[in-house]
Amino acid sequence: MKQIRNFSIIAHIDHGKSTLSDRLIQVCGGLTDREMDAQVLDSMDLERERGITIKAQSVTLDYKAKDGLVYQLNFIDTPGHVDFSYEVSRSLAACEGALLVVDAGQGVEAQTLANCYTALDMNLDVVPILNKIDLPQADPERVAAEIEDIVGIDAMDAVRCSAKTGVGVDEVLEVIVAKIPPPEGDPNAPLQALIIDSWFDNYLGVVSLVRIKHGSLKKGDKFKVMSTGQNHTADRVGIFTPKQTDKTELKTGEVGFVIAGLKEIHGAPVGDTLTLAKNGAEKPLPGFKKVKPQVYAGVFPISTDEYENFRDALNKLSLNDASLFFEPESSSALGFGFRIGYLGLLHMEIVQERLEREYNLELITTAPTVVYEVVMTSGETIYVDNPSDLPAINNIEEMREPIVEANILVPKEYLGNVITLCIEKRGTQVNMVYHGNQVAVTYHLPMAEVVMDFFDRLKSTSRGYASLEYNFIRFDPADMVRLDILINGDRVDALAMVIHRSNIRHRGLALVDKMKELIPRQMFDIAIQAAVGSQIIARSTVKALRKDVTAKCYGGDVSRKKKLLNKQKEGKKRMKQVGNVEVPQEAFLAVLKLNE
């Protein structure tokens, strides 16, 4: 146990943690040079394409240190993006230390800061490392000072390395051995193992990644999952050296996988504790806090017969992604589907892409909404995450919208642009601190504004230098209303949205104009209206196609023409009463893209 080191790497997107982990694997000989592939740990296609890490992965390496001892390094890779902070806290719960990797050219970013504080709250030892020193713009001295200034940990003797060229990687390994404490735990106590992650394998069933806190787990042991109380047998246990390698037992302090042939997807929830079936532990380990979804959207399969496959896909995906929440929903316009809760917009995109890719589904998503707190005139408080569930205006005493505290780090030359953006998004400034070249600004912003397109616009106004990290703080009263779209007087439930009253005219006009372009012309006029309650605020009409009925009258009498035109008019009127309009899929998608 003295020779085990469990650690993870905290870093901002693009600061090089996946490359650094590649180097560590190479130096310790986890894979031969032939098998070495760039970003070994980013195993999902999506992760490679977008160049981001989404899922936590783990690797066990043997490293022969300079003091002659062989150390077992258990390295758990973590994502850097703010939407996946939950994955990060899970990875950190299994470690005793973390490497804080910072790009020596760019300096500290807001999400790194947030994850670093998470690590310090969990009492982990954080070891700073300056990466990318091979770049011409690298300035390790300035960045080291910045780490001390902003994060508040000692960084003057931080290791300088370049994961790309391999300079200083040996020193990184030595620092891990020297500065990160070995795991604590009692090998003779009853087994307690924390499930860090689970995923579904079509051949093996559920595979769980676990960290043994106390005791040990042998192959063939009967264990039970503490939250469900079910017993299972460990068919295989082992470690990843990135490849799956079987072992006979996992000892205290180790990180490895357990396969018990579980078919039931929710049999091993993430954050749960495993213990032995006979004389097991009394209490479960403190897990992770359950995260609440922040953004909800309705997701519907394009063809209704895909509904069953969609449900199975969601079940499998939710095993792997513990923060996903879903419940069935039906819509008169789109049929049956699910209402899915996400942590943020990137999470939403990734989930939708994974569903479409890994499970071959074709999906359509309604506009994302946040959860509103509604106080009714009867005095009760309800939480609404779907605009069409909002009660009638005269029953609402007060609407409250969720407010987030956003911490933005931005180079000072872009500060003005960022402040303008925050004011436009109805934000209030709380704090501003200068750290050398960077400014840390804190704003309270309505979450609805943040989830729409705030992140993209923040990046574009600051040329990509600003970074953002936000968390929910409270509900505030706000003048929010539901904007309905009516087509020929009928509400289309999938197009309803909740927005601020100051915004309705602008939004309503934009919406009806967009819809007018997309709804195909019929034989009768189609009225498209945007309404709040019973008040119509914008309207446009898709004109009818009409036949030239007077074409066969040569010269002729005007009363003859009038008769024909009136007859046509009557017919159109009758059609309008019975005709109904199909809203094409493109129209729904266009509404979502309207913010852009």
UniProtKB/Swiss-Prot annotation:
It catalyses: GTP + H2O = GDP + phosphate + H(+). The keyword Acetylation does not apply. PROSITE patterns: G_TR_1 (PS00301), G_TR_2 (PS51722). Keywords: Cell inner membrane, Cell membrane, GTP-binding, Hydrolase, Membrane, Nucleotide-binding, Protein biosynthesis. The keyword Iron-sulfur does not apply. It is found in: Cell inner membrane. One of its GO terms (cellular component) is plasma membrane. Disulfide bonds: none annotated. Residues 2-184 form the tr-type G domain. It is a peripheral membrane protein. GO terms for molecular function: GTP binding; GTPase activity; guanosine tetraphosphate binding; ribosome binding; translation elongation factor activity. It is an enzyme of class 3 (hydrolase). Its main location: membrane. Pfam families: EFG_C (PF00679), GTP_EFTU (PF00009), GTP_EFTU_D2 (PF03144), LepA_C (PF06421). Required for accurate and efficient protein synthesis under certain stress conditions. May act as a fidelity factor of the translation reaction, by catalyzing a one-codon backward translocation of tRNAs on improperly translocated ribosomes. Back-translocation proceeds from a post-translocation (POST) complex to a pre-translocation (PRE) complex, thus giving elongation factor G a second chance to translocate the tRNAs correctly. Binds to ribosomes in a GTP-dependent manner. GTP binds at residues 14-19, 131-134. GO terms for biological process: positive regulation of translation. Belongs to the TRAFAC class translation factor GTPase superfamily. Classic translation factor GTPase family. LepA subfamily. InterPro entries: EF-4, EFG_III/V, EFG_V-like, EFTu-like_2, G_TR_CS, LepA_C_sf, LepA_CTD, LepA_IV. Its EC number is 3.6.5.n1. This is Elongation factor 4.
